[in-house]
Every structure is written in C-alpha cells, then in structure tokens.
C-alpha cells in the first residue's frame, strides 16, 4: 500500500516563509549561511511554490510581531487563494512574536524562564493580548474538524492538544 508523506493539513503560526522584502534575515542566515545567493533564497520562499496540490492551511499571526512580519502570512494566504488551496488566515491586532498557546500559564512560565525579557509595561501589554491571541487554538480546532471531517465522537480538545504539543517540545 502506498503512503503519502503529504500532510492532510498545516497549522502555521508566525511563519518564516518568505525570502523577499519581508524575510526574517536572521532565520535565512541560520538556514543558508552567509554565502547564500538570491536564487537559494528565492527557492525557499514558500509563497512562490504554492500549487493546488498543497494541503489546506490554517495560518495565524499578530500585527505587532517585530520578529517576523505579518506580510509573510499575507503573501502566503494570497498565494493559497490564487492556487485554490483551502485556507484560514487570522491576524490579531496585538501580541508579540512567539505567544505560542497564549495562555496565562504559558506567559507565567515564560516570565519564570526569562524574568528580565519584558518591561512591566510590555508584560501588561502581553497579558492584555492573551485573550484575543489565545482564540487561535479554538479557531484551529474548528478549522481542523471541518477540514479533516472529524466526527463529534472523535472530539479534539484543542487547548489540551495544542498545550500538550507545546509542553512536549514538539512545537520547536
């Protein structure tokens, strides 16, 4: 029996997927090294390789992300639209890069790991964004159920699934 390596769906958060004007320079430097040329970077610009064969995609980002421009997501979503690939694209107004599951528990853990990373004002701002950004897990659950035709008896607890993925380190 043949088995496909193609995923049935993708969930992308803060994706570094464009090598053009909006690329994250540090990511491409780490990936390709200092001697990469434009052709290599172009090859890794995912939005330029979207075809109708691409699996459905759930994409989320925050406009305030100073690490990875939300334009990465806009470019990819537009490429999906043009290719006829089913997708959901959610952009939240507030929130820093890497908010992961965006729960208070997650943020408390981050504060323990790196207490000096954010000023009190930045901490308050992130706390304020948790409710909105944290919606992505529920949105992803509904999207997955619809996209993968998951029956009610196969209920996925989205917060638990995504939290367990985060806790296990599989998100890295």
Regions found by a protein language model. Name each.
Residues 1-27, 37, 41-42, 160:
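Primarily recognizes the serine-hydrolase "nucleophile elbow" in alpha/beta-hydrolase
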Residues 74-172:
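C-terminal catalytic histidine-bearing segment of alpha/beta-hydrolase fold enzymes
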Residues 19, 64-68:
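Acidic catalytic loop of the alpha/beta-hydrolase fold
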Residues 22-25, 70, 101-102:
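Short, solvent-exposed loop/turn and secondary-structure capping segments
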Residues 34-49, 53-55:
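Active-site nucleophile elbow and catalytic-triad environment of alpha/beta-hydrolase enzymes
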Residues 11-14, 60, 92-93:
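Alpha/beta-hydrolase-fold catalytic nucleophile elbow
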Residues 6-9, 54-57, 83-88:
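Loop/turn elements at helix/coil->beta-strand transitions in domains of secreted/extracellular proteins
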Residues 53, 58-61, 65:
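Short beta-strand/loop motif that positions the catalytic acidic residue
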């Amino acid at each position: 029996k043949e088995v496909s390596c193609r995923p049935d769906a993708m969930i992308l958060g803060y994706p570094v997927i464009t090598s053009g004007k909006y690329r994250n320079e540090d990511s491409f430097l780490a990936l390709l090294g200092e001697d990469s040329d434009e052709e290599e970077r172009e090859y890794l610009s995912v939005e330029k390789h979207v075809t109708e064969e691409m699996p459905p995609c759930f994409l989320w980002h925050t406009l305030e992300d100073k690490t990875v421009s939300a334009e990465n997501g806009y470019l990819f979503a537009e490429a999906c639209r043009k290719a006829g690939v089913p997708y959901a694209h959610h952009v939240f107004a507030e929130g820093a890069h890497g908010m992961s599951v965006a729960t208070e528990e997650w943020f408390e853990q981050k504060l323990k790991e790196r207490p000096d990373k954010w000023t009190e004002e930045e901490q308050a701002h992130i706390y304020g964004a948790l409710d909105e950004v944290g919606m992505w897990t529920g949105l992803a659950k509904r999207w997955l159920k619809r996209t993968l035709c998951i029956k009610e008896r196969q209920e996925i607890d989205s917060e638990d699934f995504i939290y367990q993925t985060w806790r296990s380190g599989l998100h890295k």
